[in-house]
Amino acid sequence: MQFNYSKLLGRIREFGLTQKDVAAHIGIRATTLSLKLNGKARFTANEIDAICKLLHIAKEDIGDYFFTT
């Protein structure tokens, strides 16, 4: 199943961050984050949690950002 991360990408831009910034914050390479955002790899629960904290995404909204097809 392929997920659509356009809402997550928009949120990253809203915060004035780059994919490189987010990747550094969660401890992965920017290329790895790109793979995840393009559906070539999956996010771990820890990565999702860290991104939600960084971008102030409420737990009840996680599905809207990470599990939309």
What function would you assign to each model-found segment?
Residues L17, F43-N46:
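Residue-level signal for the short linker/turn that defines the boundary of a DNA-recognition helix
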Residues L9, K20, D49:
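Residues within the helices of the helix-turn-helix
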Residues I62-T69:
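Short amphipathic recognition helices of helix-turn-helix/homeodomain-type DNA-binding modules
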Residues I12, A23, C52:
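The alpha-helix within a helix-turn-helix
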Residues N46-D61:
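DNA major-groove recognition helix of helix-turn-helix/homeodomain DNA-binding modules
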Residues L17-L35:
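Short alpha-helical DNA-recognition segment
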Residues L37, E47, F66:
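DNA major-groove recognition helix of helix-turn-helix
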Residues M1-L17:
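A short, Lys/Arg-rich alpha-helix, primarily the initiator
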